[in-house]
Amino acid sequence: MRDDQIFNLIEKEKLREKEHIKLIASENFTSLEIRQAVGSILTNKYAEGYPLNRYYGGCSFVDEIESLAILRAKELFGAKYANVQPHSGSQANMAAIMALINPGDRILGMQLSHGGHLTHGSRVNFSGIFFNTYFYGVSRDSELIDYDEVLKIARDCRPNLIIAGASSYSREIDFKKFREIADDVSAYLLCDIAHIAGLIVAGFHNSSIDVAHLTTSTTHKTLRGPRGGIILSGKDFDKLVTFNGKEKALFNAVNSTVFPGTQGGPLVHVIAGKAIAFREALQESFREYIANVIKNTKVMAEYFKSEGFRIVSGGTDNHLFLVDLSNLDLTGADAEKLLEGVNITLNKNAIPFDKKSPSLASGIRIGGAAITSRGLNENDSLNVAKFIVRALKTRSDIELKQIKKEVVRFIRDFDMP
């Protein structure tokens, strides 16, 4: 690389990743094959449209690449329809929402502070700007989704669309109950499985594909693919919907809202990376990987509990959990900064019914997907939790410096994919 400034910064980032314990639940490591595809000459090709129906010439090979990605996605998820063009999970959600409802219609989504996502109706996001939004959350006592309460809220606000899914909810979501609620109020159901897609395809979480009208996901996080999005559908893929005043099959409506509705040319180099990720996730080794992610995450959560920390909802069924720091003289923002200082990266996170602002937060979110990709086992994950607890409980700069040395020495033994 001739650009020394960029090259040096990339090398610094590589060293940072090598010497830090990555616990951000939305991050992971891709394989070398995926990185090679994303960095390939495919980035040169413009390919507006869909396979065999492009607005540019010279697309025969990229048609094959996108068709292969679609075929593999359908096989992996057990779907009848897949659109692999969305540049991100947020853009996948935008396109899916626009295919199902119209501006001004009502959306019922999970409260952001209870574990939802910006695109599920937040007032600062397109979903809350162009649509009327209502929210459900978790029970104050159990910190679990109360489906009876969701039904009550749905009957009160009569949404046109219900969104199920979360970015910081550590328990299994019952998608069938959400579909029952949606059917009760004649609403569409959109399931956002961005965080749990890997668990679903590996068989460790119930699937939304034949339950929801549409399912969206990112292709990174627990899928270990490149940064990107995907839209899927099962038995409802050809259901007739009213789109721009006309009846249209759902999959055709989605194709229209992705291109030309919300995007121009697809990122063919990223689609190639997605295709590789789908193939990798179809292997038995991927199921073993997800099983280990769940084991490692549970081990860490249980250690925090044994050390007197409160875990939101009492535990975890997936790849993440939230630690409530309210009993410490420490905000989530403080903890994030402190742990960054000892080479452990995670993020501050609001907890349900949080009294602190989102910029401070009362909790931290911990994910086990990335460390498992580096080969950490349950005992290693226990050691990671011990590092964190030591750092959070000490107020000694000398001790923090010692912890940092131990963290670097520990994590260097694990290769990055």
From Swiss-Prot:
The modification N6-(pyridoxal phosphate)lysine is found at K221. Gene3D superfamilies: Aspartate Aminotransferase, domain 1, Type I PLP-dependent aspartate aminotransferase-like (Major domain). GO terms for molecular function: glycine hydroxymethyltransferase activity; pyridoxal phosphate binding. Pathway: One-carbon metabolism; tetrahydrofolate interconversion; Amino-acid biosynthesis; glycine biosynthesis; glycine from L-serine: step 1/1. It catalyses: (6R)-5,10-methylene-5,6,7,8-tetrahydrofolate + glycine + H2O = (6S)-5,6,7,8-tetrahydrofolate + L-serine. The record marks H220 as: Plays an important role in substrate specificity. Its EC number is 2.1.2.1. Keywords: Amino-acid biosynthesis, Cytoplasm, One-carbon metabolism, Pyridoxal phosphate, Transferase. Belongs to the SHMT family. PANTHER family: SERINE HYDROXYMETHYLTRANSFERASE (PTHR11680), SERINE HYDROXYMETHYLTRANSFERASE 1 (PTHR11680:SF35). NCBIfam families: PRK00011.1. This is Serine hydroxymethyltransferase. It comes from Borrelia garinii subsp. bavariensis (strain ATCC BAA-2496 / DSM 23469 / PBi) (Borreliella bavariensis). The gene is glyA.
